[in-house]
C-alpha cells in the first residue's frame, strides 16, 4: 500500500478538573514516542473534529468530556506532511470507562497548571494550557440550521413549513447527535417547520429532551415579526441553560 502524503487532520482537548478550587490538567505519557502530551488523535474517515476530539479523549484518558470553547489550532509537519490539530477546552463528566494503561498511553497524571506545562514535551502544548486557563466560564448556545431539505421547486405541499428533509438530510440529522452531545446540550428549541423539527429530533430522543416549538423562530415567523423573534431569542439566551 502506498504511503499517504496528504494532510493529517487531528483533534484534541485540554482536559481540566478542579481540586479544592484549583484547576488540574490531564497529561499523558506515550511510550512509543517517549513524550508527555495532551489527549489528541487523528480523525477517522468521514469524522469531524468535534466528534474526534471527544472520542480520542475518552479512548486515551477513560474520562468522558464536555467540550467548551475552541482553542488555537496547532499546525506543524510530520514526516514532511502538514498536520493540523484542532483543540477545545474540556471538562470531565460522569460516565467514562476509567483509565487503563495500554501500549498507546501507559501513564496519566492530573497536575497543577505550572507542573503540567513543565511536564509536557512540546512548548506548543504549554501555550494551549495557558490559553485554556485564560478562558472565561461559558455555557454553550448552538444555533443550528436544518439539514438538507427537499427543494422548494420540487415540493407540492400546501405550505412550505411542511417541506421535509431529504434522505441525506435525515442521515445528517442522525450524525449531528454526537456533535451536540459533545457540548452536553440539554434544552432544544426549534422552529415549527417540519425540516427543522426533524433535524433535532434524533438528538432530542437520545438526550431525553423535549423539543420546544418556537413559531417566531421560523422563516415565516421572523418575516412577520422580526422584533418579536429577536426578543424571543434573547429570552432563550437569558435562560442560561446549555
Where are these regions (language model features)?
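Nudix hydrolase/Nudix homology domain
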Residues: 34-35, 97-151, 155-157, 240
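Unchanged
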Residues: 43-128
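Active-site-proximal alpha-helix that buttresses catalytic centers in soluble enzyme cores
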Residues: 41, 138-227
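A generic secondary-structure signal
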Residues: 131, 175-182, 232-235
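Active-site-adjacent alpha-helix immediately C-terminal to a catalytic or transition-state-stabilizing loop
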Residues: 228-242
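N-terminal strand-loop-strand
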Residues: 2-38, 141-146
Amino acid at each position: 500500500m502506498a504511503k499517504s502524503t496528504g494532510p493529517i487532520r487531528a483533534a484534541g482537548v485540554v482536559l481540566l478538573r478542579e481540586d479544592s478550587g484549583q484547576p488540574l490538567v490531564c497529561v499523558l505519557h506515550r511510550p512509543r514516542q517517549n513524550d508527555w502530551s495532551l489527549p489528541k488523535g487523528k480523525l477517522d474517515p468521514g469524522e469531524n473534529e468535534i466528534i474526534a476530539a471527544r472520542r480520542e479523549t475518552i479512548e486515551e484518558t477513560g474520562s468522558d468530556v464536555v467540550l467548551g470553547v475552541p482553542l488555537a489550532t496547532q499546525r506543524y509537519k510530520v514526516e514532511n506532511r502538514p498536520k493540523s490539530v484542532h483543540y477545545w477546552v474540556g471538562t470531565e463528566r460522569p460516565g467514562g470507562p476509567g483509565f487503563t494503561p495500554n501500549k498507546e498511553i501507559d501513564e496519566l497524571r492530573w497536575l497543577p497548571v505550572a507542573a503540567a506545562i513543565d511536564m509536557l514535551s512540546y512548548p506548543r502544548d504549554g501555550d494551549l494550557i495557558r490559553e485554556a486557563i485564560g478562558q472565561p466560564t461559558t455555557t454553550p448556545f448552538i444555533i443550528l440550521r436544518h439539514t438538507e431539505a427537499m427543494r422548494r421547486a420540487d415540493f407540492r405541499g400546501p405550505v412550505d413549513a411542511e417541506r421535509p428533509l431529504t434522505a441525506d438530510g435525515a442521515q445528517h440529522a442522525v450524525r449531528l447527535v454526537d456533535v451536540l452531545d459533545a457540548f452536553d446540550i440539554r434544552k432544544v428549541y426549534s422552529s415549527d417547520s417540519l425540516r427543522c423539527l426533524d433535524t433535532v429530533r434524533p438528538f432530542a430522543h437520545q438526550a431525553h429532551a423535549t423539543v420546544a416549538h418556537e413559531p417566531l423562530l421560523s422563516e415565516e415567523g421572523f418575516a412577520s415579526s422580526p422584533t418579536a423573534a429577536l426578543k424571543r431569542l434573547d429570552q432563550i439566551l437569558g435562560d442560561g441553560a446549555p
